[in-house]
């Protein structure tokens, strides 16, 4: 997809993200979620308004590092101060894509803030690892959205193996022969 090599389940996840207003992409560490973010952003195209964010500062910095794209915390993107109950006047009128990484840590308030802000032309993609930490605030966002039937792609294939792990795997396979 636009110069990014994707496996079949990743291509299906990109299609899901680009054809639904709200979608979930779930998978464990190393399954290619960061690669998917780059592919989705490339498909939407340069010059279009996008917001990439994560629930915590550390997660936002990791998102930037893994994708090479600018990212913020959800609170910052929404113009929220974590200790206050108001939204600053942030305009998302032309935003066409919102990507939230580490969505398992989102609170209901964060999700509500995002869904309240997005215009009709916008797609919202929530990525997360169902085995990761849950939000310390209110809600169980990913399980709740799954229960509501929000379209979801599940990534099972691990793409991140270092040489040592691969050598160990080959030794196990050779041993069984």
Regions found by a protein language model. Name each.
Residues 1-177:
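Conserved ATP-binding/catalytic motifs of P-loop helicase motor domains
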């Amino acid at each position: 997809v636009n110069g990014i090599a994707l496996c079949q389940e990743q291509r299906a996840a990109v299609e899901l993200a680009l054809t639904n207003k709200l979608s979930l992409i779930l998978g464990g560490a190393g399954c290619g979620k960061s690669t998917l973010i780059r592919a989705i952003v490339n498909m939407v195209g340069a010059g279009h308004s996008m917001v990439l964010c994560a629930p915590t500062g550390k997660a936002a910095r990791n998102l930037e590092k893994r994708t090479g794209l600018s990212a913020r915390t959800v609170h910052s993107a929404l113009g929220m101060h974590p200790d206050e109950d108001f939204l600053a006047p942030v305009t998302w009128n032309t935003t066409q894509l919102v990507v939230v990484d580490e969505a398992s840590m989102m609170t209901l308030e964060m999700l509500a803030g995002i869904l309240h802000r997005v215009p009709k032309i916008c797609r919202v993609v929530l990525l997360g690892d169902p085995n990761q930490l849950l939000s310390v605030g209110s809600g169980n966002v990913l399980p709740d959205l799954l229960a509501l039937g929000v379209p979801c792609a599940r990534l099972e294939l691990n793409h991140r193996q270092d040489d040592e792990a691969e050598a160990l795997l080959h030794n196990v396979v050779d041993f069984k022969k």
